[in-house]
Amino acid sequence: MKNILIVDDVKGWRDFCSNVMFEIFGSDINVETADCAKAAYDLLLQAHPYDVIITDLQMEDDFSPKYAGEWLVEQIKSFNRYNNTNIIMISASYNIRHIAEVLEVKCIPKSTALKCLSAYKEALGVN
């Protein structure tokens, strides 16, 4: 069973990404969601390790000058147990590709995310 964490401040996006994960992996997954980076961080500390983490880039403003998603990815990467976790950053931000490249994670612009299931499959390495 795959454990998946979806982090976004917009419930509609959390629901959409959850549905996409069920479509890709079937029903043998456990999906948890968080509405902000801080809540996601708390889950990282107490939950079982996640195989896939999908996070929005822009959420709460508490991490200025960084984006909340940027801060969260840095925290995830500081845990050894997440070394093999697929991390996907989603955002409508114009600079998502640059930030994802610096953080060494996959990214999907939200404009593509709505239209293209294959973008998720490609980011996850799934056929």
Short names for language-model regions:
Residues 56-62:
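Active-site residues of response regulator receiver
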Residues 49-51, 80-86:
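His-Asp phosphorelay/catalytic-motif detector in bacterial-type signaling
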Residues 64-83:
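Short amphipathic alpha-helix used as the core "switch/output" element in two-component signaling
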Residues 11-32:
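Two-component/phosphorelay signaling modules centered on CheY-like receiver
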Residues 6-12, 33-35, 90-96, 101-127:
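Output/docking surface of receiver
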Residues 1-4:
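Extreme N-terminal starter segment of soluble prokaryotic enzymes
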